[in-house]
Structures are given as structure tokens and as C-alpha cells.
Amino acid sequence: MAQRVEPDTALVEFAAADKVFTNGFRALNPIDLSLARSEITVLVGPSGCGKTTLLRMAAGLTAPSSGRLTRRTERMSYVFQDPTLLAWRSIQANVELVARLQGVPRAERRERARRAIEMVGLAGFEKAYPRELSGGMRMRVSLARSVTSEPELLLMDEPFAALDEFNRERMGDELLNLWRSRGLTVMFITHSISEAVRLGHQIAVLGTQPGHLVRLFRSPSPPAAELAAPRDGAALRELRIQISEMLGGARI
């Protein structure tokens, strides 16, 4: 069973938070969930179980109908499934965009963008345009853009869903690199149980009719701050099997 995250270590807390839309549709039953600082929390579950609603709630884009949401930061970035890059702007300009909108001085935002582009392995592509890049490279640009605002909280809505297996794994590596270097708190949606187990410190399994938290798992061998730290493959395989069986044999 999951261990409770103490309030003083949680960046985001949902306390009996639910969501009922104005048409009467209940998207979420009351949910209790805490996101510990500098950890990756992954949401998995079938379509329509309220994962995106929960993510939007964390971002402040929708409010709980009842219960409470506590977010102890305003420094956050939201990464969508579609990279949503400006086609007429260079990669450099796209990565700088969020910092520019926040009023970050030009020299500083250029330096932030340079570091972010280098971190996701796209140094040398600063003058390229989105149409010249592959889908995986455009997603890396989106990830670089998301950190130029220097967020504490990174919210990701199935960001790798459109990528092939090779690029999904590479983007997972990029996310872990960013987490290690910046101590980010991450809330991440995926339909891939393997991806959830690989990336998550805790994994929230949601069910439908309406959306509710089925079970919260703590990883027996989570990502470590040290890149070379070994992980327990057998324990992770067992966790993957448990989650898969809980979701009715869904895709691993």
C-alpha cells in the first residue's frame, strides 16, 4: 500500500476533491492524493476515468466541485500531447516563448533557452523550424520550452502518446534528466503501464463510472537522483503485473 505523503513534503494535495460539471456529469468521485516535492506521480487508467480532469485541477484550470485542492506553488508548466509549436518561429524562439510572455529579460531568457535546448539534446537546431523536425524532436522542443519558466511543478497530459516506442523511451530519459537536474515535481498521464512503472515514484490507478482512485502504489524501486543507481527489475516487473491485472489485462 502507498505511504501517506506528509503535508509539509507535499507540493500539491487533493483532499476529497471531486468534479461534477454543470450538466450534471460526474467526472470524479472524491479523491485524496498528495504529490510529494521532487517526485514523479503517474496517473494511469482507462479513457474517461478523470485523469485529465485531475491534471487540470492541479493546474488551476478547473476547480473541484467540493473538497479541497492545495497547491504550494504558482511556478508550473503544462505540457500537452500536441507540442503546439509556432510553425513560423524558429526552435530558439519557440523555446523562449513562455519566458518571454512572463517578462523575463532577453539575455536571461536566451540563456535559459540555450540550457534547455542543450539538455534535451537539440543543440545545433536553434535556427531550425518545427516543420524540419521529426515528431520526437518537436516533443523535445515542447519539453525544453516547459522548463524555461523554471517551474517547480510540471504537469504532462499524455505527452508521448503519438511517439513510437524508441522515441517514447528517449523522451522518458529526457524527463528523468530534467527531474534529476532541477528537482521537479511532476504529474504525468500515460496509458502505458510500462512507462508508468519506469518513470513513477508513485502510481495512481484510476477507474471509471465515475472516475475514482482505485489504488495508489509506491514504486519498490523508484528513479534515483543518481543516474547510475541500480533498480530492482524483478520488483518493477511484479508491480507492472499487479497494475495490469488491476486494469483488466490492459496493454503493458
What feature does the model see in each segment?
Residues 12, 28-30:
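Conserved structural motif at the start of ABC-family nucleotide-binding domains
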Residues 44-46:
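The feature captures the beta-strand-to-loop junction immediately N-terminal to the Walker
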Residues 89-96:
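Short coil-to-helix segment of the ABC ATPase nucleotide-binding domain corresponding to the Q-loop/switch region
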Residues 128-131, 149:
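Conserved signature/switch motifs of ABC ATPase nucleotide-binding domains
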Residues 154-157:
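Catalytic Walker B motif of ABC-type/P-loop ATPase nucleotide-binding domains
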